[in-house]
Amino acid sequence: YYDIKIIDALLAERYTGVKSDLILENFKALHEISLKKHPDFLLPRTPLIPGITDTDENLGAIAEFLSLLGVKKASLLEYNPLWHAKLNKLGKDELGAGKSRDWMDKKHVVHCKEIFSAAGISV
């Protein structure tokens, strides 16, 4: 598995602490290697985080990036609000303040999948 969260370098740095450039270059390199020996070995995944990674713009950019590389399959990981309980146990509940505590709407998940399908990528 290889997680691709955000394509935009500045947004990636804001939310993950690092720009996406190296992450994307590493994926390209690993994808090339996997194509030669094990074409189905490397599965790109994108966690769907409300308002951050699940936007049409971001998902469209990820789907386009993967499509240009010839990727035919990816995985979208639905948002799981149970992480709030972990923060509480760690004494870090303030990190989750204002964040969604609801499961993703199924219609929105279908919409996210359709963005990838439109780029020829099954999810």
PLM features per residue range, with description:
Residues 33, 41, 103-123:
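C-terminal accessory region of radical SAM enzymes
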Residues 1-82, 88:
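Conserved AdoMet/S-adenosylmethionine-binding subsite of the radical SAM
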Residues 64, 72, 87-115:
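A structural motif corresponding to the C-terminal lobe/cap of the Radical SAM core domain
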